[in-house]
From Swiss-Prot:
Name of this protein: Na(+)-translocating NADH-quinone reductase subunit E
Gene name linked to the record: nqrE
Transmembrane segments: 11-31, 35-55, 77-97, 110-130, 140-160, 176-196
Membrane topology: Multi-pass membrane protein
Gene Ontology molecular functions: oxidoreductase activity, acting on NAD(P)H, quinone or similar compound as acceptor
Annotated EC: 7.2.1.1
Known catalytic reactions: a ubiquinone + n Na(+)(in) + NADH + H(+) = a ubiquinol + n Na(+)(out) + NAD(+)
InterPro entries: NqrDE/RnfAE, NqrDE/RnfAE_oxidrdctase, NqrE
Source organism: Haemophilus influenzae (strain ATCC 51907 / DSM 11121 / KW20 / Rd)
Function summary: NQR complex catalyzes the reduction of ubiquinone-1 to ubiquinol by two successive reactions, coupled with the transport of Na(+) ions from the cytoplasm to the periplasm. NqrA to NqrE are probably involved in the second step, the conversion of ubisemiquinone to ubiquinol.
Disulphide bonds in the chain: none
Keywords, alphabetical: Cell inner membrane, Cell membrane, Ion transport, Membrane, NAD, Sodium, Sodium transport, Translocase, Transmembrane, Transmembrane helix, Transport, Ubiquinone
């Protein structure tokens, strides 16, 4: 159990997808203007990562990995296309569910919802799972931990952005300038977690 807690904390804080690896920055920067849509996108990314990583682990371990199906057959060259297909399918399901049951969030996310399918944080989570050779329970913990870490980062940035509306920011730094500085400072803050040994 301690191993899974350690993996979860590592995925959320120490190896945060947005602030340690800078993955998923397109949607991260674009949707971080208000807390409500940022939180909704964070939930969506957590959902997709939490399901895509374990599902792709099962597919990789039982079908694509060398000697998984038949002795001597290695289908790992199909990794990328298979992983992308699973991620795209999950995003389509998520898009239909949000359109049906949460139309306000669906409209607030706009074009960024289908862009989750090509969000490199999702693909990065799946790729790290393969690279680190996580088993199924580890992939569940890692997927949800990575998603929650990304959500924590985008909600924190959205909160900062909302507060900065009332600040006297120099004209040259308004918009993305101050956002990049804020993300850099947040990344430095999260870097302090790297010294934690679990």
């Amino acid at each position: 159990m301690e191993h899974y807690i350690s993996l979860f904390v590592k995925a959320v804080f120490i190896e945060n997808m947005a602030l340690s690896f800078f993955l998923g920055m397109c949607t991260f920067l674009a949707v971080s203007k208000k807390v409500s849509p940022a939180f909704g996108l964070g939930i969506a990314v957590t959902f997709v990562l939490g399901i895509a990583v374990p599902v792709n682990q099962l597919i990789y371990a039982n079908v694509l990995k060398e000697n998984a199906l038949i002795e001597g057959v290695d289908l790992s060259f199909l990794n990328f296309i298979t992983f992308i297909g699973v991620i795209a399918g999950l995003v389509q399901i998520l898009e239909m569910v949000l359109d049906k049951f949460m139309p306000s969030l669906y409209n607030a996310l706009g074009i960024f919802l289908p862009l989750i399918a090509v969000n490199c944080a999702i693909f990065g989570g799946v790729s790290f799972m393969v690279q680190r050779d996580y088993n199924f329970p580890e992939s569940i913990v890692y997927g949800f931990g990575s998603g929650l870490g990304w959500m924590l980062a985008i909600v924190a940035l959205a909160g900062l952005t909302e507060k900065m509306k009332y600040a006297d920011i120099p004209a040259g730094l308004k918009g993305l300038g101050i956002t990049f500085i804020s993300v850099g400072l947040m990344a430095l803050g999260f870097m302090s977690f790297s010294g934690i040994q679990l």
